[in-house]
Amino acid sequence: MPSILDKVLRMGEGRILKKLTGIVAQVNAHEDTVREFTDAELREETDVFKARLADGETLEAILPEAFATVREAARRTLGQRPHDVQVMGGAALHLGNIAEMKTGEGKTLAATLPAYLNALSGDGVHVVTVNDYLAQYQSDLMGRVYRFLGLTTGCILSGQKPEERRRHYAADITYGTNNELGFDYLRDNMAWSSGELVQRGHNFVIVDEVDSILIDEARTPLIISGPASGDANKWYAEFARVARRLTRESDYEVDEKKRNVGVLEPGIEKVEDYLGIDNLYESLNTPLIGFLNNAIKAKELFKRDKDYVVLKGEVLIVDEHTGRILAGRRYNEGMHQAIEAKEGVAIKAENQTLATITLQNYFRLYGKLAGMTGTAMTEAAEFQGTYKVGVVPIPTNMPMARLDKPDLVFKNEDGKFDAVVEDIVERHAAGQPVLVGTTSVEKSELLSTKLKRQGVPHEVLNAKQHAREASIVAMAGRKGAVTVATNMAGRGTDIMLGGNAEHLAIATLAEQGLDPNETPEEYEAAWPDALEEATTSVAAEHDEVVDLGGLYVLGTERHESRRIDNQLRGRSGRQGDPGESRFYLSMGDDLMRLFNSGLAERFMGSSAYPDDMPLESKLVTRGIASAQGQVEARNFEIRKNVLKYDDVLSRQRAVIYTDRRRVLEGEDLAEQVQGFLTDVVTAYIESATQAGAPESWDLDELWTALKAVYPISITPEEVVSEAGNATRVTPEMLTREILSDAEHAYARREEELTPDVMRQLERRVVLAVLDRKWREHLYEMDYLKEGIGLRAMAQRDPLVEYQREGFQLFSAMRDAIKEEAVGYLFNLEVKRPEPAESAEESTDGAPVVPAVPTGSDGEPLAPEQEAVPAGEPERPAKRRPAARVATRPAAEVDPLGLDTPERPAALQYSAPSSDGGSSFSEGRVVRSEGGTSGGSARPAAGASSGGGGGGANREARRRAAKAAKKRR
């Protein structure tokens, strides 16, 4: 079926390529004209294009001239003129497609064409890369083109302060990684004031290495979490000791394909004896089962120096797709703590989800999505089905000259690595540069040790040496160079024969203290000479390496995905250069061991078969392709499943985040809050009058419940008297009388606080209640999803059940937000500010508002003041002056007898899993940013009560309200 769908999707290739060829002809027609422009005239074209767009012209109408302008700017600033195939790629990106451009074809430069064109609208363009290094590098290099044309660039990096991020997002073109952009979106929807927002919308995005980001990394959602309550850390160390006492096969089973474990009866008995309990599966002991399973998984499924490394007493995850350390990210659901216990390092606390989104749904937020990669056609069906974007294969500028040799399979790993070392020694002696790809830090260091014994000088590029990545990659194509690398060298790196002139020029200018952002004029002036010097130094060596056969890529193990193998191969043979590639495999490799059918083992299983004799046959090649196909099919199902379930939460998230943004941006909530009050009161009345005759209604109980919502001033007797007698009381009459009283109570509350303070109090209360209820809802949805699979045993579709019950939970949450927000508005105690102090503290006309309000559970109820970067003037508010928290508390809120805990200063950021699974994800502890920790508010002496009555009376009303809700 997929092959048929692929054929259908490829039927339109000829048509789109014909259209792109026509666009190239139009761009070329303008080239001579723009080449005659002076630098100033070329810069003025940007203003001309913006004016034409303002007059109603479309982006498509100005595309040929805009592309020609960028092409000329790139020629003048970088010394590089985009080829026709790069213009085709840029046009494909602008049209909202994925451009498949082979390695070395200049994807980064091609992206400048649509980025410039779409930035002219003023709505911003995001360019997404796979890591911080590439984001910074591309921003610095391509930013020279944009700045030449009068546009601004930004770069989002981990560790930046909120004000830095806001400034970079405000630029015309912003570079960053998928995780950083996704987390900023989630953080914006956790902000407590409009001043904390950093992003400005999602207009157009270009995703570099799009298959890695939207396919490989899409199996696990982005999650922001905070410390959970309780201390379960003691059990992790205890169960790490238990796991060491258990034996594989006899005490437990391991399914490495599905990455699951199962404890057998003998193992259960050992655990019960060790813990001194009678039954591990009693309800009281049920939580211990999770600790046991995680301890066994940590022991069997997570390998040190492959899945993670231990540096400075900390467990750091290694990304299987890139080989890079995922700085500070952590596995969720207790998995990271189990690994920490296994390694004997400090165990950090567990976390609770605060915000989450999948990469699929994040990138669906953009008005237009485009991407580029060297390997996309194999996933064309998934790109079309999930993201509604097509894949366009762009022709190469020069014919491919790389020779891909057949795989060699050895009996065991020792024989394989001996042959690998022998091959490297031979190539190195001839002077041919060699790039060796490994699948883990452990294997790269093993091979490095063997090469040292042979006296072969080499560089190692893995997660432990990631800081030297740029310099290592820049030199990997030089004569005699030997580079041993994990997947880090597979994407986003351009290995040029003889050396990378651009990298050398950048390094030279950096040594001179020149920076493209800090000293742009000096940098531009020095660039031509630096580039010319670097180009001259590598030109002669380039020709020499070409004569030696180009770069030799040697893979030591097949990856789960064919695309990752192709990415490694693609480092060689760029722009028509010669090259060579070959994979060395063994029957002990993970892919062969887990998915091989056993045919190759029967050939090589004989004890007489030499360890150093390779097997080369079509049968093995087909077996490898079959194994990779199984893994890719499994991962595709995981991604589809993740998306189906997240689509349920995505619709709910869109509603909540839209409501939240309106509150943050200063919308007048008076009408909405009065609507809340009407809905809550009506629901209480309907619950009390839905059964029985009027004389049997318990009006006293209804009144007790209503007093927990607002200070009701009429009595049941007055309502009965108004009707004549109890039998003549109707639900409509009750609703009319009580709603009228509630409206008067709202007006009295507003008059007491003043309209300005009332509006700000409404904003803070609604925002805080919404946040807390949304967090609780995420927890409930997680809990629901964990057990929903069991519904299949009752012949019910788990997804349908999840959708149905998820909607019920969402509806209940919306009702709870209304009820709790109204209750807080009437019952919070507010200290009135002294007029003199108010005038002193608030000089910009902004109302002075209460400090952080809190609820009965101690949760913060309000955002902090708007963050203004140091040294900058305060930004004017859009609709009316923004409320500020006074330096000396002008108003405080009664926390109903409980202390207010500080808002967590350290959050966890969970991103795509390093092992590609969907049952857990990683998180990251980050610095405490400005505006993230809440203060403690205590009741002040002399505070006036907004809701009447003391704390004890309020508590009684709340208990009565809860009882009424249960009956409802």
Swiss-Prot record:
The gene name reads secA
Query: By its UniProt entry, which PROSITE patterns does this protein fall under?
Result: SECA, SECA_MOTOR_DEAD
Record-stated family: Belongs to the SecA family.
Where does this protein hold ATP?
A: Q86, G104, E105, G106, K107, T108, D494
**Species of the source:** Beutenbergia cavernae (strain ATCC BAA-8 / DSM 12333 / CCUG 43141 / JCM 11478 / NBRC 16432 / NCIMB 13614 / HKI 0122)
Q: Which terms does the UniProt entry file under GO BP?
A: intracellular protein transmembrane transport; protein import; protein targeting; protein transport by the Sec complex
Q: Which UniProt keywords apply?
A: ATP-binding, Cell membrane, Cytoplasm, Membrane, Nucleotide-binding, Protein transport, Translocase, Translocation, Transport
List locations, semicolon-separated. Answer: Cell membrane; Cytoplasm
Q: Does the keyword Hydrolase apply?
A: no
Classification via PANTHER family = CHLOROPLAST PROTEIN-TRANSPORTING ATPASE, SECA INNER MEMBRANE COMPONENT OF SEC PROTEIN SECRETION SYSTEM
- SUPFAM superfamilies attached here? Helical scaffold and wing domains of SecA, P-loop containing nucleoside triphosphate hydrolases, Pre-protein crosslinking domain of SecA
Return the EC number: 7.4.2.8
Subunit structure, interactors included: Monomer and homodimer. Part of the essential Sec protein translocation apparatus which comprises SecA, SecYEG and auxiliary proteins SecDF. Other proteins may also be involved.
UniProt name for this protein: Protein translocase subunit SecA
What membrane topology does this protein have?
Peripheral membrane protein
